[in-house]
Curated annotation (Swiss-Prot):
Descriptive protein name: DnaJ homolog subfamily B member 5
Any one cellular-component term (Gene Ontology): nucleus
Cross-referenced Gene3D superfamilies: DnaJ domain, Urease metallochaperone UreE, N-terminal domain
Limits of the J domain: 4-68
One MF annotation (Gene Ontology) recorded for this entry: unfolded protein binding
Keywords: Chaperone
InterPro entries according to UniProt: DnaJ_C (IPR002939), DnaJ_domain (IPR001623), DnaJ_domain_CS (IPR018253), DnaJ_subfamily_B (IPR051339), HSP40/DnaJ_pept-bd (IPR008971), J_dom_sf (IPR036869)
N-terminal signal peptide: none
Induction (record text): Expressed under normal conditions, its expression can further be increased after various stress treatments.
Pfam (any one): DnaJ
Entry keyword annotation includes DNA repair: no
GO biological process, alphabetically ordered: chaperone cofactor-dependent protein refolding; negative regulation of transcription by RNA polymerase II; response to unfolded protein
Gene: DNAJB5
Species, as recorded: Homo sapiens
Length: 348
């Protein structure tokens, strides 16, 4: 014998749409597994969802009224009746039906939610709520207390509002880049693993995603690249933003100062005094000969204009390559060398 959907919801076969909704609301709250701990509550909750799924749809209800459960699910009556090619199968997730009806996956948050939002909760109308003295759907809260408060006398429910979701704080990662990547621009691929909501709105799955991070020419250290709402998702939150913050990698030859590039050139005392030509490497792989005809003191700076990093807002323009000289002094001198230096070097 097939299921009696009307009996499951506790309504007559001639019930109208509003009566079906009221019956489902009452029965679903009564047998929701989060509230009802009886062994058969889960199965009863599923039957209630299936009954509502059929009776709330005029086409399904019409077939059910004519052919019963078996005819509804096989596409027609057993004695040659016809209902076209329609075959009904319950989707199997009573929680999805509950979430669709009440507008949220948490069954009871909606009844105790914050009133900060000005939009009324779409699935709940206080005027439609049936509260039987012997079958209060919130009875479990009365027996065990709610937030440490004893339950007072019953009263009609007040207008309720959904809890406003709050976005999680940003998830910040350091992204180390080379000066060559800043000079040329680059794209990095970063794989992240995060939790995402399933279609039922209450369970989550883990999935990987590749984020393509475009690094533009000349971007400064500390620049932030944000991927909105790519963090973990749960039924109660807004996913966090994923933020990458640029950090310069240490370089074998150069240091960065804004759009300028600093290079330390080490020369001998002889080269510093007598002159020399120093080969200066550039960020793009070239070598520039730098003549030094004057005396070079420790800390002397020479500037090669336009050989630095691109300006972030005007990549066709570049900063400078700044050469800082260091002079390597000998560890010891022979007496003869000392005498020669005394004769030829000025006293001041």
């Amino acid at each position: 014998m097939g299921k009696d959907y009307y009996k499951i919801l506790g309504i007559p076969s001639g019930a109208n749409e509003d009566e079906i909704k009221k019956a489902y609301r009452k029965m679903a709250l009564k047998y929701h597994p989060d509230k009802n701990k009886e062994p058969n509550a889960e199965e009863k909750f599923k039957e209630i969802a299936e009954a509502y799924d059929v009776l709330s749809d005029p086409k399904k209800r019409g077939l059910y009224d004519q052919y019963g459960e078996e005819g509804l699910k096989t596409g027609g009556g057993t004695s040659g009746g016809s209902s076209g090619s329609f075959h009904y199968t319950f989707h199997g997730d009573p929680h999805a039906t509950f979430a669709s009806f009440f507008g949220g996956s948490n069954p009871f948050d909606i009844f105790f939610a914050s009133s900060r939002s000005t939009r009324p909760f779409s699935g709940f109308d206080p005027d439609d709520m049936d509260v039987d003295e012997d079958e209060d759907p919130f009875g479990a809260f009365g027996r065990f207390g709610f937030n440490g408060l004893s339950r007072g006398p019953r009263r009609a429910p007040e207008p309720l509002y959904p809890r406003r979701k709050v976005q999680d704080p940003p998830v910040v990662h350091e992204l180390r880049v080379s000066l060559e990547e800043i000079y040329h621009g680059s794209t990095k691929r970063m794989k992240i693993t995060r939790r995402r909501l399933n279609p039922d709105g209450r369970t989550v799955r883990t999935e990987d995603k590749i984020l393509h991070i475009v690094i533009k020419r000349g971007w400064k250290e500390g620049t932030k690249i944000t991927f909105p709402k790519e963090g973990d998702a749960t039924p109660d939150n807004i996913p966090a933003d994923i933020v990458f913050v640029l950090k310069d990698k240490p370089h074998a030859h150069f240091r960065r100062d804004g759009t300028n590039v600093l290079y330390s050139a080490l020369i001998s005392l002889k080269e510093a005094l007598c002159g020399c030509t120093v080969n200066i490497p550039t960020i793009d792989g070239r070598v520039i000969p730098l003549p030094c005809n004057d005396v070079i003191k420790p800390g002397t700076v020479k500037r090669l204009r336009g050989e630095g990093l691109p300006f972030p807002k005007v990549p066709t323009q570049r900063g400078d390559l700044i050469v800082e000289f260091k002079v390597r002094f000998p560890d010891r001198l022979t007496p003869q060398t000392r005498q020669i230096l005394k004769q030829h070097l000025p006293c001041s």
